[in-house]
């Protein structure tokens, strides 16, 4: 069971340094009403906030002033076996090795300087903590029929019961579009969920479309062009 910060309700608070969350770079007025998605990769850690009324706020500059503990630098986040198996089955083989990678934040550079995502993000495992859940994903870099490079963000949440489609997905869509520079968001939904019809309706309402995927036996796949 995930431990949660009573103020922000972020899952798995051990993944975060509370000094970073409370960094002065995020104003109190914005912090009290913001929905936060916390993005971690093997070589960077940065925060992304979006308000319920829309609009985005990057507060990654606060990370450079706070050094995470040695325990945090060494820590590996456990990836549930069923999620790893799902990615191994459903993702294209070009995504590379899907072994769990250590999350070691880099303090020497800003991963979103000038609004651009760090080049090291491509084909990397990524974790996103939003207010009521934790998402595991992979950023896959591909080329379209016109040989234009594009990034696809593939995501599976740990618990569909806690998915907040209104706030959580808005934060994730903004994160993928504005700063991870992804052109497509792909979400895998367990076909055996009792609330699957509700989720399918909700995904259609948000703008997702079903994607045929013969290799995905246990999951329905939904995609959105960003």
UniProtKB/Swiss-Prot annotation:
**InterPro entries per record:** Acyl_CoA_acyltransferase, ODC_AZ, ODC_AZ_sf
Q: What is this protein called?
A: Ornithine decarboxylase antizyme
Q: Which family does it belong to?
A: Belongs to the ODC antizyme family.
SUBUNIT field: Interacts with ODC and thereby sterically blocks ODC homodimerization.
Tell me which Gene3D superfamilies the record gives. Answer: 3.40.630.60
Function of this protein? Ornithine decarboxylase (ODC) antizyme protein that negatively regulates ODC activity and intracellular polyamine biosynthesis in response to increased intracellular polyamine levels. Binds to ODC monomers, inhibiting the assembly of the functional ODC homodimer, and targets the monomers for ubiquitin-independent proteolytic destruction by the 26S proteasome.
> What organism is recorded for this protein?
Schizosaccharomyces japonicus (Fission yeast)
The GO terms this record gives for MF are: ornithine decarboxylase inhibitor activity
Q: Which GO terms describe its biological process?
A: positive regulation of protein catabolic process; viral translational frameshifting
Instruction: State the GO CC annotations.
Output: cytoplasm; nucleus
Name the PANTHER family on file.
Answer: ORNITHINE DECARBOXYLASE ANTIZYME
One Pfam entry for this protein is ODC_AZ
């Amino acid at each position: 069971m995930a431990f949660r910060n009573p103020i922000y309700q972020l899952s798995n608070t051990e993944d975060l340094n509370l000094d970073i969350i409370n960094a002065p770079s995020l104003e109190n007025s914005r912090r009290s009403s913001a929905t936060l998605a916390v993005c971690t990769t093997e070589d960077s850690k940065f925060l992304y906030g979006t308000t319920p009324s829309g609009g985005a706020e990057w507060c990654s500059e606060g990370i450079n002033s706070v050094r995470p503990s040695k325990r945090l630098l060494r820590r590996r986040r456990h990836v549930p076996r069923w999620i790893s198996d799902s990615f191994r089955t459903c993702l294209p083989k070009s995504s590379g090795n899907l072994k769990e990678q250590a999350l070691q934040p880099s303090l020497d550079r800003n991963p979103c300087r000038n609004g651009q995502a760090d080049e090291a993000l491509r084909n990397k495992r990524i974790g996103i903590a939003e207010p009521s859940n934790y998402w595991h994903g992979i950023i896959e870099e591909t080329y379209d029929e016109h040989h234009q490079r594009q990034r696809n963000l593939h995501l599976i949440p740990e618990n569909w019961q806690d998915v907040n489609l209104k706030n959580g997905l808005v934060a994730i869509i903004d994160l993928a579009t504005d700063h991870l520079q992804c052109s497509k968001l792909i979400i895998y939904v367990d076909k055996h969920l009792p609330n699957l019809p509700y989720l399918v309706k909700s995904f259609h309402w948000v703008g997702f479309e079903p994607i045929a995927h013969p290799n995905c036996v246990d999951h329905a796949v939904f995609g959105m062009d960003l």
